[in-house]
């Protein structure tokens, strides 16, 4: 799909690349994207689910220590440049319907449902193929 200047949600994999220690082209692209938010030229959205997935991936794979990951998440949650969104118990049945209708994983379906409930229809993700729902514009900024 095409890129838009509307509000985009930042997927967990973009966060992982932006904050990993090893230098890479993907890290540079992810960091440059987040810098747009840090320097106030764009606002992005982020969900608690993304932050939880980020912590799980970076600590499990040894990319960051627990304390470093915790400090990053605290900074992200306090940073005003991110619109924070979250799901509630009503979102879960919607996610299950999305899972059935689009043959998506539960976690991607939950994120899609959370986005829809919050009026966010764009996502930056390395896994654009996982968000084939017709209301989502999935863009891979790392490609």
Predicted regions and their residues:
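Acidic, PIN/NYN-like endoribonuclease modules and their adjacent C-terminal/linker elements
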Residues: 1-7, 112-143
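Short active-site oxyanion
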Residues: 40-44, 82-83, 119-122
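Short, well-structured N-terminal submotif of metal-dependent ribonuclease cores
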Residues: 1-46, 63-71
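A general alpha-helix detector
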Residues: 14-15, 53-57, 94
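Acidic catalytic patch
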Residues: 45-50, 74-100
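Helix-adjacent hinge/juxtasegments
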Residues: 56-79
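Short beta-strand scaffold positions
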Residues: 10, 45-46, 86, 106, ...
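Alpha-helix capping/helix-boundary segments
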Residues: 14, 50, 91, 110-111, ...
